[in-house]
Structures are given as C-alpha cells and as structure tokens.
C-alpha cells in the first residue's frame, strides 16, 4: 500500500506542473540510474561529473567524483566510459577509499522514429575487474561482468517515458537483473523534472532493492546543465536498503570533437 501511494504521489506531482517548454526534452541517463536511447551526436561529447551519495544502516558511501564520459560516432552510436572514486565508511571503521570498477560500453540506437516516436537501443557494458586492494577494502567487485540491456523511450502526451531492462551475465560475480522507469516533463525552458523507479535484483546476493527518486536538470547556459536527484528505498531499510541516495553534478556538452560548447 505504501509503495502504491508513493508512486501515485510522485506521478501526480509531475502531472500538476503548469507549463511546457517545447524545446526541452526529458530523458533518462544522469542523474538517474536508468539509461535511455539518446546519443550525443557525431563527434560530440557528453561529460557528466557528479557526486553520488548512498546511506543505509551502518554504511555510508560516496562516489566523488563519479565520472561518465560519452562520445558520439555518427548519429546513433555512443562510446562510454564510467568510473567512480569511492569513499565508504562502515560501523565506525576507518573510511575506505579508491577507484572502483570501470564501465566501458557501446550504445547503439537501432530504432529511431523521431522525437515523438518510438526509440530503442541496446547498451552493452563491461564491469571491469578492480585491483586486489580495492576489493579488500570492499569498494569494488572482482569483475569482470557483462551487462546486456535494452532501452526504450516514447513521448506520451506531455510526458517523456523511458524504460530500461538489463541482465548481468555472471563472470566474476552474481547474476543480476535491472529494471528502470523514468517519466517526466519540462517545467520551464530551463528546468525539467522527472520521477524514477528502479529495481535491482541479484541472485542469492546483494543488492535486492527497489528505489523511488525525484530529480531533474537545470540549464545553466550553453552546453552546461546542472543535474540533481534524491530518493530512497521502497522496501524499508533492513538488509542494506538505502535510507537516502542522492546525486548532484554537472553535464558538459561539447561539439566538434570538443572544440566548442554545444546546445542540448
């Protein structure tokens, strides 16, 4: 019952926004956990630099920075590399820190019916192996593992709706399934607000969580966008469920191989 009320409340909060800016376009991707079929465009960069905080009972984890680099090859292909620097404290123990697993990947948008039509992509990524020291600190997984996801987006009335489903093939780590849903709309020419539900299930291991978050993007200027998100678990807080998770960062859009700032 609490889950249904939370979902209904979040969707209603977005539905009550009063203005739509036709030039804006809601999407998944940072600051959200769910990805979408969008790509930067040929020879363009999308760089996301952020801080991700997750707090659960007895454990606080910070990804500072969380680096997400994306480069467009043609209009439908994106090369990606993601990696966080993790600071983690647990049960009063000393803070552990270091680089965690990297995530190189390639996104291909194989269906594109325009901004108002269906768009679909696949975005395979590799969770790379981490150093022995990082694994001993508990800030990285052994790796490698292989993520095979599918992303779908469609405009429904004033809302942009994104869905992602994926599966981690077991390499050195558990099999894991992810499901993500993002819906949102522009509020002004500068501000976009979205709601996300994200479900992450691993076989016989953590994580096993469903989270709800609200977030958005605010255009600061040409090629610069502020990113923000805050949420929590919908399953209670036992078993390592996040009592709070949040993201704050900036998106930098560059065109012509990075020579100029680009527009969204």
Stretches found by the model and what they are:
Residues 1-11:
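Bacterial N-terminal signal peptides that target proteins for export
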Residues 26-264:
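Transmembrane beta-barrel domains of Gram-negative outer membranes and organellar outer membranes
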């Amino acid at each position: 019952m609490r889950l249904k009320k939370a979902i209904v409340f979040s969707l209603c909060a977005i539905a009550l926004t009063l203005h739509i800016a036709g030039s804006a376009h809601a999407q998944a991707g940072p600051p959200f956990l769910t990805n979408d079929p969008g790509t930067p465009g040929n020879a363009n960069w999308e760089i996301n630099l952020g801080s991700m905080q997750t707090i659960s009972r007895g454990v606080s984890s910070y990804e500072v920075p969380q680096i997400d680099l994306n480069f467009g090859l043609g209009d439908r292909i994106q090369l990606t590399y993601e990696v966080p620097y993790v600071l983690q404290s647990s049960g009063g123990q000393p803070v552990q820190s270091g680089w965690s697993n990297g995530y190189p990947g390639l996104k291909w948008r194989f269906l594109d019916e325009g901004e108002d039509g269906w768009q679909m992509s696949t975005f395979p990524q590799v969770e790379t192996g981490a150093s022995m020291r990082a694994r001993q600190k508990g800030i990285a997984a052994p790796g490698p593992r292989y993520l095979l996801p599918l992303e779908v987006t469609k405009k429904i009335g004033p809302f942009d709706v994104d869905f992602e489903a994926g599966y981690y093939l077991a390499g050195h780590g558990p099999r894991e399934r992810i499901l993500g849903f993002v819906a949102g709309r522009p509020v002004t020419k500068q501000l976009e607000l979205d709601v996300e539900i994200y479900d992450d299930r691993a076989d016989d291991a953590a994580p096993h969580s469903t989270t709800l978050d609200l977030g958005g993007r605010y255009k600061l200027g040409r090629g610069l966008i502020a990113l923000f998100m805050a949420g929590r678990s919908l399953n209670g807080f036992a078993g390592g469920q996040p009592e709070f998770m949040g993201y704050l960062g900036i998106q930098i859009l560059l065109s012509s191989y990075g020579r100029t700032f680009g527009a969204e």
